[in-house]
UniProtKB/Swiss-Prot annotation:
Gene source species: Arabidopsis thaliana
Subunit structure of this chain's protein: Homodimer; disulfide-linked. Dimer formation is driven by hydrophobic interactions within the N-terminal luminal domains and stabilized by disulfide bridges.
Cofactor: Mg(2+)
UniProt note on tissues of expression: Ubiquitous. Detected in the apical meristem, at leaf margins where vascular bundles end, in the anthers before pollen is formed and in the ovules at a very early stage of development. There is no expression in more mature embryos. Also strongly expressed in the cotyledons immediately after germination but not later on.
Protein name: Serine/threonine-protein kinase/endoribonuclease IRE1b
SMART domains, sorted: PUG, S_TKc
Side of membrane Cytoplasmic, spans: 379-881
Catalytic residue positions: D608
The encoding gene: IRE1B
C-alpha cells in the first residue's frame, strides 16, 4: 500500500504542474461580432459578462481584470436541431405523404423561433412566440403529429467560484429541514450539494453572493404517420440575476416578518449574458481544456450519523467538521489578454512560439502520465503475484462436478449437469486461466479453490449462468448444501441489492416467485442466493420455436443452456397444430399472472417484467417464476401510485415499458399490466412482439401502433391483450381480472360458462325490452357472421328440429341449443355423439371452431351486466380452470 500511495503521489506531483503551464487564451475572430453585438457599451467598459456556449457551458469574464474567473458546465446543450433527409423515403408517395409542404421549425441567430414553409413556390420564415406556440400543441393531422414541451430550471451558483449550490427542476424539487434552537429553518442545499453555507450564518456578510441562472428550454418535434421523426428543434434561453445579501437571509432562515403571500427570494441585479449558438466551450477557449476546474483531493465520507427514534424518524447527529472540508489544488490563474479586444470586435494572433511551446508541454505531460500509470500497474501486478496459494476448504459441499462433453452430430461440446439444472457451455482454456488470475488478484477471494470460492455459508462456483447490466453476474453455487443460483452484484450497487432482497423477503414462499435463501458479501461483491432454475422464458420460447420450425435445430439448443428441458432432442409442446397455446404454455402464462397478482397484493410494482426476467423450473411439470426485482418498488401504504421521485428515469427495459414509463409520468400497478401484455404476446407467437422489432418498439409504444394480427385467430387473446396494451393505464384490467380471463379457461370451464349464460339469458323477457338481451343480440353480426344453421352439419340440424323451432340469427337460441345438447349428451344418437366429439374437449371444439367469437362476446356482455351476480362469481372470483 505504501508503494501504491507513493506512486500515486508522484503521478499527482508530475501532472499537477501542467495545470500552471498554460497562461492566456485565444478566441477566434469568427465569434467577435456575435459577442460584441449582444453586449452594451457600459458592460464592455466595466463589470462582468457571462458567456454561454452551445454545449451549455457558462463562463464568467471579469472585464476589469481581463480574466476568466470560472466556468460551469451544465452538460445540457442550449441548441440542437434535426431534419430528416428526403432520400430516406424510398418512393415518391412516401416522400410526399410524409414531408408534405416541407414545413419545419428552427430558431435564428437571435434565438427567436420561426416556422419555415413553402408558399407559392417560395420559402417563407415567420417568427413565432415559442411559449404561445407550444401552448397550442399537440397538433395532429393525417400525415403528421407535432409535439412540444417547455421546461424551466434554475441553477444556483456561487458567484465567486462558480460552484453549483442547487439545481431547481420540477422533477427534482424537494425540501430538507434541520432543527436548531427548537425552530425549524429551511435549507436550500440538498444532501448531495456542496456544503457552501448552512444554517449557522448569522450576519449578511457571512453569506456568499449567489447568481441565479434562469433557463427556459423549448422542445418541438414533428413525427410522420410512419413513426419517423421529420424534424426537431431544442433550444434554451438563459438569463442571470445576482442575489444580494438581504435576500439570502430569507434562504437560510425565514424571518417572522415575512408574510404568507411574500416570495422570499428577490432579485436585485441582472448580469449581462451572451449565448453563442454555434460555438463550443473548447472552441471559444481552446487552450483551457481540462483546466477550467480545480483539482480536488479525495475527502472523507461525511454522511451524517443517524439514529432511528420514535416512530421511525431519524435524528441527525453532528458530523465530523474536518470531513466537511473539501481540499482543492489552486486553480491556475488564466489571463485572457484579449478579452477586451473580443468585446470590441478585434483579436490578436498568438505567436508561433507560444503554440509550439504549448504543444511540447502537452506531449511531455502525456508521456509522464503514461509512464506513471504503467509503473503503478506493474507494481500492483507484482504485489498480486506474491499472494499465497488459496486455502481449500475441507467442509463438504455440493461442488459442481465436471462432466465430459458429448457431441450430437455437428454440435459443439455440451455440458450436462445433475438434477437437470443448467450449466455453462464450453470454455476456452485461456478464459479459465483468466478466471483463476482474477480470483488471485482480489484479496477477498483468497479462500478459493479451483472450482470456486467460499463466502460465509455460500460456495460460489466459477460456472457462469448469465450476465446482467452494471457488472452483475449470475453463477452456480451452493448455499448450506443446496444448489442455488448466485447473483453477484458489485458493492457500488448496494442499494439495488438491498431493495431486491427486501422485496424477495416480502414476496417469498409464493410458488410463482423465485425463492430467496440468503445473502452474503465480501470486500468487493454482494451475493444473493436464489432458487436455481432451468432457463428463462425467453430461452424456452425461442428454442421451442426453433424446434417447431426445424427438428434439426436441437443441435444448437445448448447455446441457450436449456438441455434438461429438451430430452432426446424433443422439446415440450407449447403450441397446438392450429398455432394456439397448448395447455403447457397456458399454465406457464397463468403462472406469470399469478406471480404478478401476488406482488400487487402485497404492494410491489415489478417495473421490469420481460421474458428474460421470467425463469422456468422443471419438476414434475414446468413452472414459471418472476425474478429480478432490483428496480421494483413498494407502494406506500393506502396508495395506488408511486411518488414522482420514486418513479425514476430508466425504470424497466426498452421495448417492454409502458408509455407512462417512457414519458416518466405517474406510474401505478398498470405499468406491469402493459408489460404483461407484451410478454403474453411473446409467448403465444413464438417470440414476436406486438410493437415490432427492437429498434422501433419504444416509438410504436408511444404512438400506440401495435399489431395483433398474429393472434387474430384467437379472439380471447385479442380481447385480453387489447385491454392490457391500452395506452390509458386507467383502462387496463387488474392482474386479478386477467387471472380469470377466458383465455386461460379449459374446455370444461368454457362449456360450463356457455351453459350458465344460457340459463341466465332465458330469465330475460324478450317482449319487455331487456337491456341484457338487446346487448347480447347486438353482437350477432360479429359472433355469428350470418345464420348459425349454415355452419352446422345437417345431421345435427335434423336432430334439433325434431323438438322445437329456433331462430337461426339469434345468439340466445344458439346458446339454448348448446345447453340442451350438453345436458342430454348421453341421450343423443351414437353417430351424433361421434360428430360432436367427447365431452368436454371434443364437444367444445365442435362449436368453438364454427363460432370462434361466441365465448368472448357472450363473456363481455355478461361481464358488463351480471358481474355482481352470484352465478358469475364462479368465473370472476374463483380460480377454477
Amino acid at each position: 500500500m505504501r508503494g501504491s500511495a507513493l506512486l500515486d503521489l508522484i503521478l499527482f506531483l508530475l501532472v499537477s504542474p501542467l495545470a500552471h503551464s498554460f497562461k492566456g487564451s485565444e478566441i477566434s475572430k469568427f465569434y467577435d461580432k456575435s459577442i460584441s453585438n449582444q453586449i452594451s457599451q457600459s458592460d464592455r467598459e466595466s463589470g462582468y459578462v457571462l458567456v454561454s456556449t452551445v454545449d451549455g457551458s457558462i463562463s464568467l469574464v471579469d472585464m476589469s481584470s481581463q480574466k476568466l474567473d470560472w466556468t460551469f458546465h451544465t452538460n445540457e446543450p442550449i441548441y440542437s436541431s434535426y431534419q430528416a433527409p428526403h432520400y430516406h423515403y424510398t418512393t415518391d408517395e412516401e416522400r410526399s405523404s410524409v414531408l408534405g409542404d416541407d414545413f419545419y421549425m428552427d430558431c435564428d441567430k437571435d434565438w427567436r423561433l420561426y416556422n419555415s414553409s413553402v408558399r407559392k413556390g417560395k420559402r417563407v420564415n415567420e417568427i413565432v412566440d415559442a411559449s404561445e406556440f407550444i401552448g397550442t400543441l399537440p397538433y395532429t393531422s393525417t400525415d403528421r403529429i407535432v409535439l412540444g414541451k417547455k421546461d424551466t430550471s434554475v441553477f444556483l451558483l456561487d458567484w465567486k467560484t462558480g460552484k453549483l449550490v442547487k439545481r431547481y427542476r420540477m422533477d427534482e424539487l424537494y425540501s430538507n429541514t434541520v432543527v436548531e434552537n427548537d425552530k425549524e429553518k429551511a435549507i436550500v442545499l440538498s444532501k448531495e450539494a456542496p456544503l457552501l453555507f448552512g444554517s449557522g450564518f448569522k450576519k449578511s456578510e457571512d453569506f456568499p453572493e449567489l447568481v441565479y441562472i434562469e433557463r427556459k428550454d423549448f422542445k418541438i418535434q414533428c413525427i410522420s404517420k410512419f413513426g419517423d421523426v421529420l424534424w426537431s428543434v431544442s433550444y434554451a434561453k438563459m438569463e442571470a440575476k445576482l442575489q444580494n445579501h438581504e435576500s439570502v437571509q430569507f434562504i437560510s432562515g425565514l424571518s417572522s416578518s415575512v408574510g404568507k403571500n411574500q416570495f422570499p427570494l428577490s432579485y436585485t441585479t441582472s448580469v449581462p449574458m451572451v449565448q453563442l449558438r454555434n460555438v463550443k466551450y473548447e472552441t471559444l477557449f481552446p487552450r483551457l481544456g481540462f483546466l477550467d476546474e480545480a483539482l480536488y483531493l479525495p475527502f472523507q465520507d461525511r454522511k451524517p450519523n443517524q439514529l432511528a427514534i420514535g416512530d421511525g424518524n431519524q435524528l441527525t447527529l453532528p458530523g465530523n467538521k474536518e470531513a466537511e472540508e473539501v481540499l482543492s489544488l489552486p486553480l491556475p490563474e488564466t489571463v485572457i489578454s484579449q478579452i477586451t479586444d473580443i468585446i470590441d470586435g478585434s483579436t490578436k494572433q498568438a505567436g508561433f512560439a507560444s503554440k509550439f511551446s504549448g504543444l511540447i508541454v502537452l506531449i511531455f505531460g502525456f508521456c509522464v502520465t503514461m509512464l506513471s500509470v504503467c509503473g503503478l500497474f506493474f507494481y500492483r501486478l507484482r504485489q498480486s503475484i506474491r499472494i499465497k496459494e488459496p486455502y481449500v476448504s475441507e467442509v463438504p459441499i455440493a461442488t459442481p462436478k465436471k462432466k465430459k462433453s458429448k457431441k450430437n452430430g455437428t454440435t459443439k461440446a455440451v455440458h450436462k449437469k445433475e438434477n437437470g439444472f443448467i450449466s455453462g457451455g464450453n470454455k476456452d482454456p485461456s478464459h479459465e486461466e483468466n478466471e483463476k488470475r482474477l480470483l488471485t488478484a482480489f484479496p477477498g477471494l483468497n479462500n478459493s479453490s479451483a472450482e470456486g470460492y467460499r463466502v460465509g455459508k455460500l460456495f460460489v462456483s466459477n460456472k457462469e449462468i448469465a450476465k446482467g447490466s452494471n457488472g452483475t453476474v449470475v453463477l452456480e453455487g451452493s448455499y448450506e448444501g443446496r444448489l442455488v443460483a448466485v447473483k453477484r452484484l458489485v458493492q457500488s450497487h448496494h442499494d439495488v441489492a438491498q431493495k431486491e432482497i427486501l422485496n424477495l423477503m416480502a414476496s417469498d414462499k409464493h410458488s410463482n416467485i423465485v425463492r430467496w435463501y440468503g445473502v452474503d458479501q465480501d470486500e468487493h461483491f454482494i451475493y444473493i442466493s436464489l432458487e436455481l432454475c432451468a432457463c428463462s422464458l425467453n430461452d424456452l420460447i425461442y428454442a421451442s420455436s426453433a424446434l417447431l420450425e426445424s427438428p434439426m435445430a436441437s443441435s444448437s439448443i445448448h447455446s441457450i443452456q436449456i438441455n434438461p428441458i429438451f430430452e432426446n432432442g424433443k422439446g415440450v409442446e407449447l403450441w397446438k397444430e392450429n398455432g394456439h397455446p397448448s395447455p403447457v404454455l397456458l399454465k406457464l402464462m397463468r403462472d406469470i399472472v399469478a406471480g404478478l397478482v401476488h406482488l400487487h397484493d402485497i404492494g410491489i410494482v415489478h417495473r421490469d417484467l420481460k421474458p428474460q426476467n421470467v425463469l422456468i423450473v422443471k419438476n414434475s411439470s414446468l413452472c414459471a417464476k418472476l425474478s429480478d426485482m432490483g428496480i421494483s418498488k413498494r407502494l406506500p401504504a393506502d396508495t395506488s401510485a408511486l411518488t414522482r421521485n420514486s418513479t425514476g428515469l430508466g425504470s424497466g427495459s426498452s421495448g417492454w415499458q409502458a408509455p407512462e414509463q417512457l414519458r416518466n409520468e405517474r406510474q401505478t400497478r398498470a405499468v406491469d399490466l402493459f408489460s404483461l401484455g407484451c410478454v403474453l404476446f411473446f409467448c403465444m407467437t413464438g417470440g414476436k412482439h406486438p410493437y415490432g422489432d427492437n429498434y422501433e418498439r419504444d416509438v410504436n409504444v408511444l404512438n400506440d401502433q401495435k399489431d395483433l394480427f398474429l393472434i387474430e385467430s384467437l379472439p380471447e387473446a385479442v380481447h385480453l391483450l387489447t385491454g392490457l396494451l391500452n395506452p390509458d393505464p386507467n383502462l387496463r384490467p387488474r392482474a386479478q381480472d386477467v387471472m380469470h380471463h377466458p383465455l386461460f379457461w379449459n374446455s370444461d370451464m368454457r362449456l360450463s360458462f356457455l351453459r350458465d349464460a344460457s340459463d341466465r339469458v332465458e330469465l330475460e323477457n324478450r317482449e319487455e325490452g331487456s337491456q341484457l338481451l338487446a346487448a347480447l343480440e347486438s353482437t350477432a353480426a360479429v359472433t355469428l357472421n350470418g345464420r348459425w344453421d349454415e355452419k352446422l352439419d345437417s345431421i345435427f340440424l335434423d336432430n334439433i328440429g325434431r323438438y322445437r323451432r329456433y331462430k337461426f340469427d339469434s345468439i340466445r337460441d344458439l346458446l339454448r341449443v348448446i345447453r340442451n345438447k350438453l345436458n342430454h349428451y348421453r341421450e343423443l344418437p351414437k353417430e351424433l355423439q361421434e360428430l360432436l366429439g367427447s365431452v368436454p374437449e371434443g364437444f367444445e371444439r365442435y362449436f368453438s371452431s364454427r363460432f370462434p367469437k361466441l365465448l368472448i362476446q357472450v363473456y363481455t356482455v355478461l361481464f358488463d351486466y351480471c358481474n355482481n351476480e352470484e352465478f358469475f362469481f364462479k368465473y370472476s372470483k374463483t380460480t377454477v380452470f
